Amino acid sequence: MKKKTKGLKTQKVPWYGRRLNVYLLLIGVTVLVYFRVFTLGYTMLDDTIFIKENQEYNKSWSNIPVSFQRGLFNPTGDSYYRPVFLVDFIIESKFFGTSPAGYHFSNLLFHVLCVLLLYFFFLRLKIPDLTALILTLIFAVHPVLTQAVAWIPGRNDMLLMIFFLSGTLLTLKYRETPKWQLLVAQFLILLLALFTKETAVIIPIIILAVLKIDNGKWKTENGKFNFLLLLSWALALVIWFLVRSAATLKPQDFTLTDLLVNGFNRAPVLIQYLGKIFFPFNLTVFPDIRLIAPWWGVAALVLLIGLIIMSRSYARPLTWIGLGWYILFLIPVLVVPASLNDQVFEHRLYLPIVGILLVIGQVSICLSSMIKDQGSRIKDQGSKTKDQNPSNSSSNSSSALRPLFVQQVRQGVIVFVLLLFSGLTFYRIGCFKDPVTFWTAAVDGNPTSAYARMMLGLRMTEPAQMKQRFEEAYRLNPNEKMLNYLIGKLALDDNDIPRAERHLKKELEFSQIPDNYFNLARVCFLKNIPDSAAFYLEQVIRLEPRHPQANHNLLLLYLQLDRRDDARRQIQAMRDKGLEIPPEVTGRADLQP
């Protein structure tokens, strides 16, 4: 006998509750906003180092383990340790070679993956479907994250986010189903995160806080579960520390006091970054903390505090987790010494911005609840009034419409913000089109940077324009590394020997550039000081042993100076290096060993 179903109603699932619809929307919006990245080239800010200059390094699979034993930019004289980043370029070089388009494609792919993982993460935190979708869309199109996606080296922050979110999702799954496979998987992913960026040491703190909440409230976890998880994290940290300690990195001479002083001096960055999240109108590709107007940040801070108080979301744990998330992931930016990096690049907000989105999500949930409660009260009050005085029905109807109006206004604001952010991001992608465009934007956004003007000068094709940019940079900072070398090289090309010598010698105070020594050798040769020329050529070979022209010229110079023993040693050294020896030298009997 069939059961009667007449009168039963099935609740219709809204479009944002259908997962496939949401996935397609998130992917579609992200690709639509960022499709311009396929037209981008290099910026000449580190990207060519990892792809072009490291071309030989990237060719060999055997350099994958080597990447865990060296620094990022230099095998021995570097403070940055990013082995996963180097390994990524080794792998991708097999597919893309030195074509920037392929690396821009993978950057976009990483961003899409981060967007999807973030949406899953919000849902796992029991954030309502529509709120999770809106927060994820804001992340996907936010202008402050443009550099992370459009600038090829910005991928490191995206890789860290991928490992962080996937590891957190696995840990949350392990809480529900404590299988050893999940425990091992999250352990391996944490290791990858640590070898991606040192910031990953903060990840266990954030995950612990997330594990302590359930349906928006604090809870106590099983002791055995926590012990196994903590043990796996401790093991990952020990392995990372030991491997990193064995790497050939440049020793750091700053103390804990130095880090604390740096953190105090750079604390305004927290407010400046907050301003860029809420009001992304003062963005630049090469920012300087001293030039960023504080007012946007102060306004954003006041707005955030006001929203938290007004919505009473301060009672929700995720609000505090979000604030802690934002601050903790920015600590490395605060304490990094200016000698290592003095720029407050916007791609570093890729992970911290999620903390602010969590706070905004809690504010939204609380405000929605307040509007819903207000609507229910008005409806109940209207029903009572109608029973008592039917003539006031029109007044009751207008009161009931108020929550609906507020809801419509909020929806309009969300759509406007998403469209505005998408437009700003679409426009900003163009700043990364090519070196001239990028460094022009850098100078416009940071006019006091000698480095930016120097790099723009290097991109100029006309010597007069190049010279003008170098002179502008010199007026800003005569001690800028590499600048005196470039000015001296131009002066040498113009046959201005005294000026060339002055600048080339000054560069020795700041750097050890092989070509700088080579040009000093040219100066000495033109001044007919062969002994000094030989000295500078020896320095070139010390720094770059296989420099062909330096080896060739030094050999001929030894012969000119009648330094036959030195000439014999130089001939043998060139043979050992596989360098060609001039034919007029090889046949001389007096130079045979």
Each predicted region: which residue ranges?
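C-terminal luminal/periplasmic domains and tails of membrane-associated envelope-modifying transferases
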Residues: M1-K9, V13, D373, D380, ...
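Polytopic membrane enzymes that build or remodel cell-surface glycoconjugates and lipids
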Residues: K2-K372, N392, N396-A464, E471-L486
